[in-house]
Amino acid sequence: MTKSELIARLAERYPQLVAKDADYAVKTILDAMSDALATGQRIEIRGFGSFALNSRPPRIGRNPKSGDKVMVPEKRVPHFKPGKQLRERVDAMVGQPIIED
């Protein structure tokens, strides 16, 4: 599901919401989540999951084109951990085909 599909589904599910308002709501939520992660905060949405930052240590990598060794610096990456309700809901789908767009 893309961001525009999420906005369309939100507007469809709540007819009192104008599509423009649904767009604003989704963008506001995503901006708030991005800002929180950018400042090192953890985000927890009960029943859905949590977002946090993981730190990846510096390492020596290889340039795939030349094969030369390259120093890859330390970096922080967002990490999502699904909540119990989400895990159970997804697990209940075992045996059903996965829909790929």
Curated annotation (Swiss-Prot):
Which GO cellular component terms are attached? Answer: chromosome; cytosol
Q: Which InterPro entries match?
A: Hist_DNA-bd, IHF-like_DNA-bd_dom_sf, IHF_beta
Q: Which GO terms describe its molecular function?
A: DNA binding; structural constituent of chromatin
Per its UniProt entry, which superkingdom is the organism in?
A: Bacteria
Please name the Pfam families in this protein's record: Bac_DNA_binding (PF00216)
GO biological process, any: regulation of DNA-templated transcription
Q: Which UniProt keywords apply?
A: DNA recombination, DNA-binding, Transcription, Transcription regulation, Translation regulation
Q: How does it assemble?
A: Heterodimer of an alpha and a beta chain.
- Family per similarity comment: Belongs to the bacterial histone-like protein family.
Role description: This protein is one of the two subunits of integration host factor, a specific DNA-binding protein that functions in genetic recombination as well as in transcriptional and translational control.
For this entry, the protein name equals Integration host factor subunit beta
